[in-house]
């Protein structure tokens, strides 16, 4: 109610590598609202009654997610890609872990949170950073060295399946790659653009335009502090599953053996640049991106220089990066048992 009276918004997001809190308001009201961040960061403010409600809500969200075969297939491939690494777990948790959390654990978490590195960005020059303890306000010169990926060269357990009664087959194929602050990540972003950006993308042309096979297709390549996953996903009907799967493996093989043509490379670069402009248009998006970069130990003005790096990358570079990270993929399937067994046979013959 306090925020609504000033027409302000407070947004919170938790992800694999951190937590983001965003406060938006008119400049004239910011001084009155800014102390809320102090309360959120420094003082336990969740009453036990509210904790119980939040715990039930978290459980409901997890239970709903378990009903979605796409989520199950996605979570399964993370389990075999990362094993006991934090990236193998769902940010929303699971039923067992949520039920084990007690109110005292939340109070202890506040103490842990106060010790973590925090970064604050605002466009309000009158903001007094000293109100917040342990906030690094002037961090633009703080950069970590490039994190080298600690890759699993070949995962012996590269296949996982989930049986469902659905007539839809869901497929995820992918590998661990590099952290976001690696120079290799730009080549992988170009590859993502080539595969999945728009109606000119390879996945759309092969699976939808030419063959009319898939309900959905795309690439998942997120920003991560450590090894990010590079995943291609598809959903397809049972009758088209084998043909679609063979096409997918053929595309994956081409990524490891063929260079992009000059036209393909130019178009992929152009789409990537335009995507970046589209994603970082609003003040909120730009600020969140800079805070995210700081949290990853990167230059908050990294994006200013990215276009020059994109322009320098050649098809040969992308092929070499593909060979470096995508040679030993893992696969996750969801569908009826017999269809999964048929696809598993195709997979075992290839990998």
Could you say what each language-model-derived stretch is?
Residues 1-146, 171, 177-179, 209-351:
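Charge-rich, well-structured scaffold segments of protease-associated domains
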Residues 145-204, 309:
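His/Glu-based metal-binding/catalytic segments typifying zinc-dependent metallopeptidases
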């Amino acid at each position: 109610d306090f925020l609504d009276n000033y027409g302000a918004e407070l947004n919170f997001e938790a992800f694999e590598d951190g937590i983001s809190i965003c406060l938006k308001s008119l400049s004239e009201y910011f001084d009155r609202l800014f102390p809320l961040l102090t309360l959120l960061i420094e003082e336990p403010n969740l009453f036990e009654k509210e904790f119980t409600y939040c715990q039930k809500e978290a459980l409901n969200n997890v239970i709903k997610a378990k009903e979605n075969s796409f989520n199950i297939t996605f979570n399964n491939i993370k389990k075999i890609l990362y094993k006991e690494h934090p990236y193998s777990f769902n940010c929303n948790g699971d039923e067992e872990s949520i039920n084990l959390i007690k109110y005292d654990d939340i109070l202890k978490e506040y103490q842990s949170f106060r010790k973590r590195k925090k970064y604050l960005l605002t466009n309000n020059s009158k903001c007094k950073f000293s109100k917040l303890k342990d906030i690094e306000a002037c961090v633009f010169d703080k950069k970590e060295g490039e994190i080298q990926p600690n890759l699993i060269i070949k995962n012996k357990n590269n296949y996982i399946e989930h049986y469902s009664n659905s007539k839809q087959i869901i497929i995820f194929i992918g590998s661990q790659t590099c952290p976001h602050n690696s120079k290799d990540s730009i080549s992988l972003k170009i590859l993502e653009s080539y595969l999945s950006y728009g109606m000119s993308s390879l996945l759309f042309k092969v699976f939808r335009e030419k063959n009319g096979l898939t309900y959905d297709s795309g690439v998942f390549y997120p920003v991560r502090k450590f090894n990010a996953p590079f995943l291609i996903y598809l959903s397809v009907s049972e009758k088209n599953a084998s043909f679609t799967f063979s096409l997918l493996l053929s595309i994956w093989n081409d990524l490891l053996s063929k260079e992009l043509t000059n036209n393909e490379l130019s178009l992929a670069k152009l789409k990537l640049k335009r995507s970046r402009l589209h994603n970082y248009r609003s003040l909120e998006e730009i600020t969140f991106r800079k805070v995210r970069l700081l949290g990853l130990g990167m230059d908050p003005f990294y994006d200013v220089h990215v276009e020059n790096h994109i322009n320098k990358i050649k098809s040969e570079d992308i092929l070499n990066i593909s060979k470096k990270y995508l040679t030993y993929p893992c696969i996750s399937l969801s569908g009826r048992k017999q269809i999964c067994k048929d696809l598993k046979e195709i997979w075992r013959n290839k990998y």
